[in-house]
């Protein structure tokens, strides 16, 4: 899989990682799955946490009603490439497909997907993560309530 290599400064990378790391400290919005020596990290955070310059550098949208879903996969301390697909379903049963975009800078690799949310929205995520480093695709399911 060929990955885009967007430009950007180290400061932009720092802000993006800080925004993702901030949300990783919130137990209700993040998680980790361990499959042998492969670790899958996932989190959800408001797109407004991404500084405007970082969002522009990576063609990301910032909006009050937009959440970012962040997936990263590592084998040891090395990021690994993956194909990620999936859907999000709200409490009314309305489903939407999430398109994940790889973000690559230096030694970091993240996959970000955008999800529009309504106030006090409850969402179920059904994602498939596939990588040559994994013996089989992993079905990741989690639920989040957004305020």
Please give the residue ranges for each predicted region.
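N-terminal secretory signal peptides that target proteins for export/translocation
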Residues: 1-10
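Bacterial N-terminal signal peptides
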Residues: 10-24
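Beta-strand-rich domain onsets/edges
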Residues: 30-68
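Extracellular Ig-like/FN3 beta-sandwich strand-entry sites
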Residues: 66, 120-124
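Short edge beta-strand/loop segments characteristic of extracellular beta-sandwich folds
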Residues: 68-74, 112-114
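Aromatic sugar-binding surface patches on proteins
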Residues: 105-112
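Short, exposed beta-strand-loop hairpins at the edges of beta-sheets
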Residues: 115-116, 125-138
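Short beta-strand edge segments in extracellular beta-sheet folds
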Residues: 143-147
């Amino acid at each position: 899989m060929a990955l885009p290599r967007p430009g950007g400064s180290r400061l932009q990378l720092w802000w993006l990682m800080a925004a993702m790391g901030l949300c990783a400290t919130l137990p209700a919005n993040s998680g980790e799955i361990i499959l042998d020596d492969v670790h899958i990290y996932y989190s959800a955070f408001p797109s407004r946490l991404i500084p405007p310059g970082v969002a522009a550098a990576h063609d990301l949208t910032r909006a009050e009603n937009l959440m970012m879903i962040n997936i990263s996969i590592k084998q040891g301390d090395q990021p690994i490439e993956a194909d990620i697909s999936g859907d999000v379903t709200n409490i009314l049963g309305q489903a939407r497909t999430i398109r994940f975009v790889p973000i690559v800078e230096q030694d970091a690799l993240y996959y970000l997907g955008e999800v529009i949310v309504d106030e006090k929205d409850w969402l179920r995520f059904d994602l498939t993560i596939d990588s040559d480093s994994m013996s089989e695709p992993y079905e990741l399911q989690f639920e989040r309530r957004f305020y």
